[in-house]
């Protein structure tokens, strides 16, 4: 059983906690604290419960034997009519929870009582252009500041104790289609963010800022042919063209509006000192307009955090013609290959394949399907490149209004979309929220216009099965086998948490937060929150007890883009709640995991 070294006696813990809240509530978040986040379950100061994004907690006071007694202790409403999709992961520092809501709002909440301490609402213009709902996925903490991105493509720094604005910087022009929905991150004292907007023909980029004052430090474009920069004393210094030169993998001038937006944010591997980001779809979707691999779209990138230099890349879907993106999280873990331990990273791609890479150099180790139906490719070659099924690429429109339609699986919303998976080092398994669906897709003619949708394609998403779309899967990265699965009627659209207590938590659009036995997949607990659970659950220790929190609120891309699937969820209610749970106190004190 994992117990904190600070907690020799329960009563002492209560006294210390009270002292912390009263006297040390203003303690600054340090870089060392961020790096040690996975080892300090009393706080959560990173998105992903650690800079590597494993979403694993070493706590086991709450475990597979007692989780059936888990009960709500408080709930907090985001209030007002600004509901829509809620996809944030909360952070917790010194008894205060920090999280975001739809429409670029930030809340600070007392983690013991659910009392709101402060709220910040960004003043958004009327012409914001988010592709996939007005969601936000969370904040970053550093020093005495809270950082988040807005739907009009700004970074905002707030005083974490008062919610007052310390600085605000424009990252990109929202009128071109840029926005920010992902949580930024802190790496070696730098504030790192990506951008969204690939559906509008923006040029993706990753940028680093001084968190104290918002000064831009470096910028790295994610489309081949664009110059990267470092900034000193406010002056831009050229730092190499992404990909070396324009036009190598893009025809004509399309690289100028190439998309590849790193819209989901990234993680950091301190062992290699690399930032790991994914990039989105190339623009436009009509692949016949842009023959070639279209780097660095639908790829994973490793960047030097000092200056943004690209150290390696791996492209999961070259010449993407299905909007499969490559943004999904790349989780660092140690992989045993023939008795040799490799510094690896894994990702479950929207295209339906699960990839294991060497995170020191990006080399392909292995890949395999993780969903039941993939039609666009017949497999992967020895380098991890897809073996295309040419009949599944939608046709060129030619002189017609649209080209020939084809049925493709998975659908463009992906075998797995944004919702983060989790890795449990005790079981050696990844827990992947996935979906089984397909689509009819066809290409159309398109010309770029600033701020307008730049797709050149049409589509209708369809379910593949009558009784389920979502599947929570436990996947062994070494064998490539699925260990267990749990089906869900609606598409899964929320993140996953796993713990040393042999538990896996995730939510459903039907409104349930659920817990599963990490080894067997048996459902061992659930709670109805009143609206779809799209957020990423967290767990932490406070006053000698283990808590679980999750955001509830239906929305996101599925009801907006889901075609026939959207009909399945049309009666699901929107919402905006933060739910927090724990065991009754007497069970917390006697908890243990049985062999």
From Swiss-Prot:
Q: What residues sit in the active site?
A: 323
Q: Where does pyrroloquinoline quinone bind?
A: 87, 137, 181, 197-198, 263, 350, 417, 493, 557
Gene Ontology molecular function, alphabetical:
alcohol dehydrogenase (cytochrome c) activity; calcium ion binding
- Cofactor comment: Exhibits enzymatic activity only in the presence of lanthanide ions; maximal activity is observed with Pr(3+) and Nd(3+), and the activity decreases gradually with lanthanides with atomic masses higher than that of Nd(3+). PedH activity is found with lanthanide concentrations as low as 10 nM and up to 100 uM, with a peak in activity at 1 uM. Binds 1 PQQ group per subunit.
Which cystines does this chain contain?
A: 131-132
Report the SMART domains cross-referenced here. PQQ (SM00564)
- InterPro entries, alphabetically? ADHI (IPR034119), PQQ_b-propeller_rpt (IPR018391), PQQ_MeOH/EtOH_DH (IPR017512), PQQ_rpt_dom (IPR002372), Quinoprotein_ADH-like_sf (IPR011047), Quinoprotein_DH_CS (IPR001479)
The places in or outside the cell where this protein is found are: Periplasm
Q: What is the effect of changing residue 561 to S/Q?
A: In contrast to wild-type, this mutant is able to oxidize 5-(hydroxymethyl)furoic acid (HMFA) into 5-formylfuroic acid (FFA)
- What is its induction behaviour? Induced in the presence of lanthanides. The underlying regulatory network is responsive to as little as 1 to 10 nM lanthanum, a concentration assumed to be of ecological relevance.
Query: What other comment is given for this protein?
Result: The soil-dwelling organism P.putida KT2440 produces 2 PQQ-ADHs, namely, PedE, which is Ca(2+)-dependent, and PedH, which is lanthanide-dependent. These enzymes are crucial for efficient bacterial growth with a variety of volatile alcohols. The functional redundancy of the PQQ-ADHs and inverse transcriptional regulation of PedE and PedH represent an adaptive strategy of P.putida KT2440 to optimize growth with volatile alcohols and aldehyde substrates in response to the availability of different lanthanides in the natural environment of the bacterium.
Q: What does this protein do?
A: Alcohol dehydrogenase that catalyzes the oxidation of a range of substrates, including linear and aromatic primary and secondary alcohols, as well as aldehydes, but only in the presence of lanthanides, allowing bacterial growth with a variety of volatile organic compounds (VOCs) as carbon and energy sources. Is also involved in the transcriptional regulation of pedE and pedH, most likely acting as a lanthanide sensory module. Uses a specific inducible cytochrome c550, encoded by the adjacent gene in the locus, as electron acceptor.
Classification via NCBIfam families: PQQ_enz_alc_DH
Protein name, per record: Quinoprotein alcohol dehydrogenase PedH
Record organism: Pseudomonas putida (strain ATCC 47054 / DSM 6125 / CFBP 8728 / NCIMB 11950 / KT2440)
Highest classification ranks of the organism: Bacteria, Pseudomonadati, Pseudomonadota, Gammaproteobacteria, Pseudomonadales
